[in-house]
Amino acid sequence: INEVDEGEVNEVKPLKVKAFATMDEVVEALQQSESEITIFTSGTTGQPKKVIHTVQTLTRSVRRGERYQGQVWAYAYNPTHMAGLQVFFQAFENLNTLVNVFSLTRAEIYRLVEQYGITHISATPTFYRLLLPFEQEYNSVQRITLGGEKSDQHLYDSIHCIFPQATINHAYASTEAGSLFAAKGDAFQIPIAIRDKFK
């Protein structure tokens, strides 16, 4: 490799440390990052495949602005998977609170929803099924997103009973492409930018 001085291979070098004065500076640095992140497909259709994303491709669907500030996200996905990374970046770039609920029990999840006033949950239908049966409503939750698996009207109805103030949608995505489109119930809309990719 042309840029590598062979005499410096395996030699310890100090890292250049960048100090940030504010979290806004950290977010700005992230948005300008040229770093790559390697993740693997689920293996649903065969052997898991390695997929390399840039920070830019992972954050392209992040929505920022005043209306996204002050949200409290339940972090219900594995942080090394596409959906986990997308939830992380959505929360991080808006300086939102992330509450880890991954692999917790139903009782622990409900306790954290109440304790932190969780406003947004993005998880698989299996995660939401694990919240059943329920004993009370949780009105702090404003938005529910399902992804990763097929769902049904019975589950939507149950979620609405648990989180009566929440809007519910279903996201369709892939590890290779990230979030593609979202549905409310059984009807989904394909964004204009990618409609020509579907028949």
Tell where the protein language model's regions lie, with residue ranges.
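Conserved AMP-binding A3 loop
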Residues: 36-63
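Alpha-helix/helix-capping structural signal
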Residues: 56, 126, 149-150
